[in-house]
Amino acid sequence: MLGKIFRSYRDLPRVIHLLILLEFSLSLIHVAFILILNIFLRKQGFSDPEIASFNSLRFIGALAFALPLGIYIRGKKLKPFFILATLIVPLTSGLIIESVQHQVVPLIQLAFLSWGFGMMLMRVCSLPFIIRSTSAENSTEALSLSAATWSLATIFSGVLISGLDWVGYLTLGVWTLIFDEHSILWIITVLGATSIFFAVRITEGEQEDTARNDDLFSIRKSYDWSLIFKAISPLILISIGAGLTIPFVNLFFNSVFGLTSSNFSLLGSITAFLVFIFSLLVPFLRKKYGYWMTIVVVQALAICCLVIMAIMELYAEFSFGIVIAVIAFILRQPLMHMAHPAANELLMNYVGKKNQELISALSSSLWSASWFVSAKVF
């Protein structure tokens, strides 16, 4: 079975492999910023409310431009947008690092806003590109591999950050490089900049002229709005719930069970590995058990894990409380994430070809909105 699963991913179109490498490279930067950028900001003297305000700007960038982009790219080639994303994200990442280092607040704000825009370009364009470049036989594999890049980048970035922190410094003659947050972020940003080499090698066929929508202001009749809202309503509920809970899970374990950042990082590494494995199993499960089992049942189990984790606060003084909470946490994330590839495939097929770019943009906007609200709540 494992050999069959491996071959199904190996036999994907070359452009999908290039897109996956592009997503992985940019995700390295994204993960590194999530893991240590806030620590870097705090060490530079910024308060927690200021840090939350900076982070909210990257979601504003995605919120403001995702919907217009989704309308604009219908029927257009997506390679130029991937190239633009691979230029914007590393450049604005460097701008964030240096503006934080020198405490230039206006530049920090501009860089966060632009960084969010760059990541949004990749996210909004990836889903329709995958659907365009695959068939019904291998679209689940492509979407699953795309979903797995985030967890793989989490593992790789986490190991690299921990390794460089453990080494401490590098001496070459009279030159010494200290591996602090500033230098580590720069190293990973340079690694992420290699994404441009994958973007320029992507090839696309001609798109149908009849699918193009060049008028951003005449969209009422261009899309099946009732179908779109029906399709996206479950995602609205899931994104709101995730945005209001997941960003604070580390605080929950710290305040209720006394877990340190090191302990929680270890849990994060375990869950990232499981997310990667579970994501790769999605095509096999979807083809064997169908969408109902792969999406509805799996997400219901993930929600149950979240509820169990919260209930364990009532039993924090008992030794079994933390054990059950940790098990629920480790299982929740892989279960919820393994439903995403199948859900995205079902969503794109349900809304039809002419609505796919817009539904991808709306999906990105919803997740950005949920994290923006979380940043403001914090």
Where are these predicted regions, by residue range?
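Helix-loop boundary and gating motifs at the non-cytosolic
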Residues: 2-64, 227-268
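Loop-to-transmembrane helix entry/capping segments in MFS-fold secondary transporters
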Residues: 48-49, 136-149, 261-262, 351-363
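Helix-to-loop junctions at the C-terminal end of transmembrane segments
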Residues: 65-78, 165, 278-291
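Glycine-rich segments within core transmembrane alpha-helices of 12-TM secondary carriers
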Residues: 144-165, 364-374
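C-terminal membrane-cytosol helix-exit motif in multi-pass small-molecule transporters
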Residues: 189-208
